[in-house]
């Protein structure tokens, strides 16, 4: 029997506000344990939450970016559970009235086609703390993350393969990153993914029993975990077994999933309205204000790059991978840079330098103005493409004018025949044996002079002009 794969994803995105959702503590990542906490985070008796307006702003932006309807009257709920990293014994979340609902995004499949993936809801909530189990037999609780604002984005079960799930996550990450509400860095926990997967016989309308996957710390592991589950569940069903509703984690070392616990249902959390927070009204003016702050998104930019700038689909996709890179590219083109040349540099030398240095493009000294000027002096013959690589490294580290650096460092190409011809004559005088070989008709003897000339000019002779002049002067030797 063959089975159809059904996948839905729950994505937790940490919002990059300065303070937490209900307390004034810093929400910044990387501090010493429990440094970013106060009495609200520790849930001392009598403390009350105070809503961070910036979190609602971010929620509205996310809902708009994901083509969602927005609840004009929004409230919070208590999700009750006990765990050491949750000192209140409940989490403030949203249950029946999330900030956004009925959304969708389009994903691009491997065959080049597109597919719409529906998004059920996006709700705001507070993050929990973090437990660390030490080798000394003790467990430690760090509440720096407690109360950090999250938006949980829940897709419909519209994905039919691990590859579609991967494409959905890639598209979702791009969109959220463009809004500016999160840096979506999985390595820092600001984007976390839980996957729900089930199988059903082809032609059956009813979904099978789902399994939830956790510990998916990269998009690659999401795909690998789902691929493993497809095989595990299909094998179990074909042998007459029954799929239980359970939570499993992906074990990277063993390339498989491991049972964590039997899955709870929503009723186990005993949701009820949060009594310490009011109803929040979101009017059209607020929504319009947030909409005005949104940028043009990747899909629209890719279409523009292909249709207006003549770039390939691949180049357009690479240039829109992050908003910072796309903005950099657009600035360079607006300053007169040739779109294809700017694209080539950003995907070539610039990308290699960033990878080697472990930096992002906004962390280096090369500005779009610097890059455009450098491309221009390559085009006008001031420097060669080979010399440009040296110039680029200097500009990436130090910034400044490309032309000014080239002139100061003595890197300007020699293109003037009045300068090059005497140097060629000196090369002939200094290499009598090579001249004799050439005159005697020795095969490829003329090629040696190119190297001699480049050495004599310390690589600064314009290659095209040099070849032309060499050919003329060698012909005179032959005559």
Curated annotation (Swiss-Prot):
This is Aspartyl/glutamyl-tRNA(Asn/Gln) amidotransferase subunit B. Belongs to the GatB/GatE family. GatB subfamily. One of its GO terms (molecular function) is ATP binding. Its EC number is 6.3.5.-. It comes from the Bacteria. Heterotrimer of A, B and C subunits. Pfam families: GatB_N, GatB_Yqey. It catalyses: L-glutamyl-tRNA(Gln) + L-glutamine + ATP + H2O = L-glutaminyl-tRNA(Gln) + L-glutamate + ADP + phosphate + H(+); L-aspartyl-tRNA(Asn) + L-glutamine + ATP + H2O = L-asparaginyl-tRNA(Asn) + L-glutamate + ADP + phosphate + 2 H(+). One of its GO terms (biological process) is glutaminyl-tRNAGln biosynthesis via transamidation. It is an enzyme of class 6 (ligase). Allows the formation of correctly charged Asn-tRNA(Asn) or Gln-tRNA(Gln) through the transamidation of misacylated Asp-tRNA(Asn) or Glu-tRNA(Gln) in organisms which lack either or both of asparaginyl-tRNA or glutaminyl-tRNA synthetases. The reaction takes place in the presence of glutamine and ATP through an activated phospho-Asp-tRNA(Asn) or phospho-Glu-tRNA(Gln). It comes from Streptococcus pyogenes serotype M12 (strain MGAS2096). The keyword Repressor does not apply. Coiled coil: none annotated. Keywords: ATP-binding, Ligase, Nucleotide-binding, Protein biosynthesis. HAMAP family: GatB (MF_00121). The gene is gatB.
